[in-house]
A protein has these predicted regions:
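N-terminal cap/lid segment of alpha/beta-hydrolase-fold proteins
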Residues: 30-68
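Short substrate-entry loop that stabilizes the transition state in hydrolases
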Residues: 70-72, 78-114, 183, 257
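Alpha/beta-hydrolase active-site loop
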Residues: 119-139
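Alpha/beta-hydrolase fold nucleophile elbow
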Residues: 140-152
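Glycine-rich nucleophile elbow surrounding the catalytic serine of serine-hydrolase chemistry
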Residues: 150-160
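Hydrolase active-site cap/lid region
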Residues: 160-223
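Serine-hydrolase catalytic core
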Residues: 217-298
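C-terminal catalytic histidine-bearing segment of alpha/beta-hydrolase fold enzymes
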Residues: 276-340
Length: 340
């Protein structure tokens, strides 16, 4: 009986891990046509509306605004995996108390939004561009103080939009434990015989260790694990070279998806540091440094409290909320990147 419960727990964990993961070529020819509209806020400062994306499909957005006319700083959330909305905890309420507007959205093919699910490819990246265009035109918004917070796989969407649309008026990107590219990360994990990667592909293969032929046929987020063209459209470690704003990585010692591995973190932040020309930092480590696998013990990583476990539910944890709140306040109000 104990063995059955243990196996059930392991496969539930694998299913949650799959949700996290499921958590550059030339720009498509698109013409932004976002129109401003009168926004009706509830007594609690919340508004629900839809705006056209760059391809004309409507995308649903949620806005929470402090009382008053502003202007206020704005934080746009980008969900990971197949999530519909990024903010799934008390963080927006805590940000509201600090005088910060939050904007949340469902990408095309998700929730109330029109279109087909693009799994954080160019179409979803265009959704974020449309939202930034819309938000930056609102009267209660500080035009030079719009930030992005991405969760997990949302880093792929956020970095893609920032790289492909460098003129977006974004003050900073905060990335909580995003993968460099799910396909590439899994390939690397398999090559290094990392437990999380082996368990994930077995789960995707109905609980069995896949043969070479089966492995080549496994799909994740609509694409083969080995489809280079597919993952090139969803590769934060490539997009990071061209991001057009300061970049802050938030990383716990135990990653919510990739265990103790930090290869994905290193791939993104080192690329941004060496190629983008932007201010970069991971946690409270010194800014603009190059990270090494051999020196991981020398860097500062966050830790969960004793009653918290790394995983999909980490997005709801008080530890993550509190740490993200502190970094959001720092980036909006202290603006450490301006002292570079």
């Amino acid at each position: 009986m104990v063995k059955v419960i243990h196996n059930l727990s392991r496969y539930v964990s694998l299913f949650l891990l799959l949700l996290i993961f499921t958590a550059c070529t030339s720009n498509p020819k698109v013409t932004p046509t976002v129109e401003q509209q009168e926004i009706q806020f509830s007594s609690g400062g919340t508004a629900f509306l839809s705006i056209p994306s760059l391809n004309g499909n409507k995308i649903a957005i949620h806005i929470k605004k402090p009382a008053g006319d502003g202007p206020f700083p704005v934080l746009i959330g980008v969900a990971g995996g197949d999530g519909m909305y990024a903010f799934q905890s008390a963080l927006p309420i805590r940000l509201l108390e600090k005088g910060i507007v939050t904007v949340d959205f469902a990408s095309q093919g998700r929730g109330e939004s029109e279109g087909d699910d693009n799994h954080h490819g160019f179409v979803h990246q265009d959704d974020l561009k449309a939202i930034v265009d819309f938000v930056s035109g609102l009267s209660f918004v500080q035009k030079d103080n719009i930030g992005i917070l991405s969760y997990s796989y949302g880093a792929v969407l956020a970095t893609g939009a920032l790289a492909r649309y460098p003129d977006m008026p974004i003050a900073f990107l905060i990335d909580w434990e995003g993968p460099s590219s799910p396909g590439k990360d899994i390939q690397r994990g398999l090559e290094n015989d990392e437990a999380w990667a082996n368990e994930l592909v077995q789960f995707l293969n109905n609980g069995r260790e896949p043969t070479s032929e089966e492995l080549s046929q496994i799909l994740l987020h609509g694409g083969s694990l080995f489809d280079e063209a597919y993952w090139a459209e969803r590769d934060a470690s490539r997009f990071a070279a061209d991001i057009s704003c300061p970049y802050l990585r938030v990383q716990f010692d135990q990653d919510h998806a990739q265990g103790l591995s930090k290869s994905h973190m290193i791939a993104i932040i080192n690329t941004a540091t060496m190629s983008s020309g932007q201010w970069t930092r991971c946690n409270d480590n010194p800014p603009n440094i190059i990270y090494s696998e051999e020196e991981l013990s020398h860097y500062h990583f966050h830790h969960y409290s004793d009653n918290e476990i790394a995983g999909l539910s980490s997005i709801y944890s008080q530890s993550v909320d509190t740490i993200l709140l502190g970094y959001v306040e720092e980036m909006f109000f202290s603006r450490p990147y301006e002292s570079q």
